[in-house]
Amino acid sequence: MHAKITALLGALLLLAACSSPPPEPPPAGPPGGSGGAGSRTIVPGSQQDLEASAGDRIFFAFDRSDISPEARETLSRQADWLRRYPNVTVTIEGHCDERGTREYNLALGERRAQAAKNVLVASGIPASRISTISYGKERPAVVGSTEEAYAQNRRAVTVVN
């Protein structure tokens, strides 16, 4: 009986030793890839599509809510993108840097979001497709008390709903 168990265990060990190793996974490509097998695909009409096609944010000068020429170009691309996807709605988030009171920055963030919305509406996008919200200084993109951080935080971000 002991010999049979030993023979059976030996056979199992031989079978296990003969099994082939698992195949190697394919090499990882750069994020966003070229659309080949295994790369991340951007879904048309998605937030990622908006970011890649038009850009999702514009920036403002200190304590300002007027639209710069660069911001106007981004909003023009966003309007073109929104025309391609007539069923998509968006929310424009207004943001500020950390300077100023909470109340002041909430109001300034709302003016920034509304200014961006006004440009999109003037470009032919129905106002009913665009909502606005202000986060003031509550959601910084960059944490820090430098001019570079402040500049990145004074923004309006268009978010696909």
Describe each model-derived feature in a short phrase.
Residues 87-95, 110-141, 154-161:
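A non-catalytic structural micro-motif
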Residues 1-8:
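Bacterial N-terminal signal peptides that target proteins for export
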Residues 14-17:
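C-terminal motif of bacterial Sec signal peptides marking the signal peptidase cleavage site
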Residues 19-89:
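Periplasmic peptidoglycan-binding/tethering modules of Gram-negative envelope proteins
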